[in-house]
Amino acid sequence: MDDKKAGAGVSAEKQKALAAALSQIEKQFGKGSIMRLGDGEVEKDIQVVSTGSLGLDIALGVGGLPRGRVVEIYGPESSGKTTLTLQVVAEMQKLGGTCAFIDAEHALDVSYANKLGVNVGDLLISQPDTGEQALEITDALVRSGSIDLIVIDSVAALVPKAEIEGEMGDSLPGLQARLMSQALRKLTGTIKRTNCLVIFINQIRMKIGVMFGSPETTTGGNALKFYASVRLDIRRIGSIKKGDDVIGNETKVKVVKNKVSPPFREAFFDILYGQGISRQGEIIDLGVDAKIVEKSGAWYSYNGDKIGQGKDNAREYLRENPDIADEIENKVRAALGVVAMNPTAAATPVAVED
């Protein structure tokens, strides 16, 4: 009995000491600097924005890319990296969000972005001269609390000032990696507080002399690999032809890292030239997988009605009948447990004081 009383006394003392410590922390660093997970003040449901690809939203496990996080999208040249990010920009703008594009490569095609559904009139764009300038602009935009999505295209083009001002053959090892490491240390906390999604596009390089394992690596050192909540590996796996003409690419995206859901899932979709990700093509493929759309030979049917012979004709039918496309998509979402996007999901501005 005495032991129980003693235990209760120690427990009460501990609780009192903890309450005093929490009070001191809040007094020194502000309310909300520390809290219990069960208090309700901590965000339990992850806010997301769609990638523009239903299959990729499903592969990500939460219905899209998580807000308030860092995301890395990498792959070989012409694999669809910029197309995918511009689709995310278009989806964020549909939700009423404000987006910025840091074009370090100085290669953004405005007319192509417009074709993908991006409202280019409202898109903020910066074409910085140095890597430091690009990351300072990113930091200022994140701290404003008024930006919902920032795209940096690309990490490989974030050239340190010392390299630009130096001679062509100068050896400056690790300079870009140190720049990225310092920037991400500074940015990550602010990104979380302002609920801003920051997407880094990255390129692939080959490591020399690798005998075992993949010789591929991404630029900018290892910091981004650690700080990114989601890493997507995008690859072109084939061509889409109409007769003898190539009209698009068959694309595979692998979720290499995912801190908000199980990783290593894959998504397959078509990217059509001048149109972006083929929503209708994905609805057909996922509809067949979920047994919502029937396929018999080359014919596709829905509710007993034939919708086209061959995927191209079925895709065209859904493009001409958007109501049926929406109906099939909603059934696919329900079957796979992926909810539709919330139209009021844009963040409330939260400025961060220096």
From Swiss-Prot:
Entries under Gene3D superfamilies matching the protein: P-loop containing nucleotide triphosphate hydrolases (3.40.50.300)
Residues the record lists as binding ATP: G75, P76, E77, S78, S79, G80, K81, T82
UniProt keyword annotation of Cell cycle present: no
Keyword Coiled coil: no
Subcellular location: Cytoplasm
Protein keywords: ATP-binding, Cytoplasm, DNA damage, DNA recombination, DNA repair, DNA-binding, Nucleotide-binding, SOS response
GO CC terms: cytosol
Superkingdom of origin: Bacteria
GO molecular function, one term: ATP-dependent DNA damage sensor activity
InterPro entries on file: AAA+_ATPase, DNA_recomb/repair_RecA, DNA_recomb/repair_RecA_CS, P-loop_NTPase, RecA-like_C, RecA-like_N, RecA_ATP-bd, RecA_C_sf
Single Gene Ontology BP annotation: DNA repair
A Pfam family it matches: RecA
Record NCBIfam families: tigrfam_recA
Record-stated family: Belongs to the RecA family.
Function comment: Can catalyze the hydrolysis of ATP in the presence of single-stranded DNA, the ATP-dependent uptake of single-stranded DNA by duplex DNA, and the ATP-dependent hybridization of homologous single-stranded DNAs. It interacts with LexA causing its activation and leading to its autocatalytic cleavage.
Protein's recorded name: Protein RecA
Organism annotation: Cupriavidus necator (strain ATCC 17699 / DSM 428 / KCTC 22496 / NCIMB 10442 / H16 / Stanier 337)
Protein's gene: recA
